[in-house]
Regions:
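Membrane-associated feature with strongest affinity for ZDHHC
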Residues: 1-165, 169-176, 180-353
Length: 353
């Protein structure tokens, strides 16, 4: 019964994780998979609304506590799994040897070390000191000069964003990770990647060890033999499922590095791609207030061109003759991502020491 329950919960949690991570990708648009993801998000929003209501009643302390449930739960589950592995699975391995024992314990220590570093490191809090060496400038397409955070009331550098969970702005903001209850940004992206790689190593190496521990055992007897076989079989199933999800997620981030974007910027570029698809994005010469691109819109039956920064009307019938307007027909061919310096350079920048 316990074995069946673990397998069932593993499959359900794996499907939910897959839907949340990949259900909105272009390949699944307008399919039942995207509809399932939207339904899951709708249920999640209802739950979060209840939490917010209850949080207000408790003077804002509830969500701070709940935010730590996932990382604390993760560490507890991993610790229990390690204990069970050392107690039941390790003795099943014939003559593990010093090197194998070293790699096993090193993999365990690496999990804890990477989790601590990713959880408690500074993502890139904005200060006057670190702004002096910050290398990114606004591209006047998805990031603009003179932008101010409406919450922090500080100037927003290019590629930065305010996190509603942490209630701070961070440099080179990527996303807020619930697994570490911390944002991923300019200074700690390297620790986030180490966290992912250490989990892939744990799942891959752990799954391989469980497989070899079970090799002498008849597979059809796993669920009916001793406790060690059952636990090792559960570990093998868990490792086989979650290594796929973790690896796909890691390769997704490597793809973002290849493209020269962050998770946050991907949405902004999607908006630009949408404008290009509608045929309303234009490049202008000369620039206006340092803006090189405008969006075509219709106001009172007349065509105007508005700012991408704040939607002010920059060009109308009175001054349109003073500018050269060139329609942007392709994001790939007509626009340049100034933050993309090639995969290896992008990787070095993101893994900044």
């Amino acid at each position: 019964m316990f074995f069946t329950l673990i397998v069932f919960l593993t499959i359900i949690s794996s499907l939910a994780t897959f839907l949340l991570l990949f259900g909105d990708s272009p390949s699944f648009r307008n399919t039942p998979i995207q509809k399932l993801r939207n339904s899951l998000l709708s249920i999640s929003r209802d739950i979060f609304q209840f939490y917010h209501w209850l949080d207000e009643k408790l003077n804002g302390q509830l969500l701070k506590i709940l935010n730590w449930l996932v990382p604390v739960g993760y560490v507890m589950v991993v610790t229990v799994c390690f204990q069970q592995f050392l107690t039941h699975t390790l003795p099943m391995l014939s003559s593990p040897g010093l090197f194998r024992l070293f790699t096993i314990y090193f993999s365990m220590v690496l999990i804890y070390a990477s989790t601590i570093l990713a959880t408690f490191s500074d993502p890139g809090r904005i200060t006057t000191i670190n702004l002096k060496s910050y290398p990114y400038t606004p591209n006047q397409l998805i990031f603009f000069d003179g932008k101010t955070c409406s919450t922090c009331h500080i100037a927003k550098p290019a590629r930065s964003k305010h996190c509603s969970v942490c209630n701070q702005c961070f440099l080179l903001y990527d996303h807020h990770c619930v697994w570490i209850n911390n944002c991923v940004g300019y200074y700690n992206y390297k620790w986030f990647m180490l966290f992912l790689i250490s989990n892939i190593n744990m799942l891959g190496y752990g799954g391989w060890l469980c497989y070899w521990a079970l090799t002498p055992v008849s597979w059809r007897k796993i669920t009916s033999t001793n406790n060690a076989n059952k636990i090792t079989g559960i570990f093998l199933i868990l490792c086989s499922i979650f290594i796929v999800i973790t690896t796909l997620f890691t390769f997704l981030h490597l793809r973002y590095i290849y493209l020269g974007v962050t998770t946050n910027e991907l949405d902004k570029w999607s908006e630009i791609d949408h404008l290009v698809g509608l045929g309303v994005l234009y490049q202008i010469e000369p620039s206006i207030a340092n803006e090189n691109y405008v969006e075509r819109a219709i106001l009172d039956g007349n065509a105007v061109h508005i700012s991408l920064k704040d939607e002010r009307i920059l060009i109308d019938n009175n001054n349109v003759k003073n500018f050269k307007l060139q329609l942007i027909q392709s994001v790939e061919d007509d626009l340049v991502n100034i933050y993309d310096h090639g995969f290896w350079n992008n990787l070095i920048e993101r893994l900044k020491w």
